[in-house]
Amino acid sequence: MKYVVKVGGKRLRPLILNEISSILGVKTENSDRVAASIEFIHCYSLVHDDLPAMDDDDLRRGHPTCHIEFDEATAILVGDAFQSLAFEIISHKKTHNNSEVRCHLITELAKSSGAEGMVGGQMLDLEAEKKTLSLEKIFQLQRLKTGELFRFSCIAPCILAEKFKEFEIFENFSSKLGLAFQIKDDLLDVEGNAIDVGKKTGKDLKKGKETLVSLLGKENAKKKSKALIEESIKIIEPFGEKAKNLIDLANFIISRNK
């Protein structure tokens, strides 16, 4: 587990969660625990995603994947342990002194990472290797597999702050941000190289999988991701100077090279 965490990563989801928490006045000691939980869910998903039965990858974040560095059985258990640890942290009283808030967070994280979210999206991703999916189905796949964890990162601060008027604002922000992130990921798979990206590229093309880039075309995909980021920034601009770091993060999503 230490190996998986220490090899690096962008930590985007916890960064987004902490920035929104700052905007809404959530205490750092509370938001940090939820940020750790979402990052551990993300770590679990990557470890399992890299397994031979899934994407069968041997490189992640520029280092050997968990099942290559250790073995397949260990990698499965590591993923399981990350998932358990995420819920152990988020359910603790230190996360929030209101048990209803903690229950709400647990429910949302379970939905975002389970069959109605990330796991459901991964199932659609496996189906995409066997049959051609429509653009609508690809959008659904990415909304579940990638977008739901972004959604949790954006709404969890509203739950922590008990400010539910902002819930819809940040949920809308997350939908645009998550899709822009996935389009950029698909573009990096086509245009990037393994050294910069930190993982093998060209995988989807080799597997014959349809992606947002293959269906939209590279130029249209770039325009779409740029438009989504511009729309997401407009949503949070009313928060003024407090949203500056969050705006920088949004711009980073389409300017990154890994």
PLM ranges: what are they?
Residues 1-237, 241-254:
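Mg2+-dependent prenyl diphosphate-binding active-site environment of isoprenoid biosynthetic enzymes
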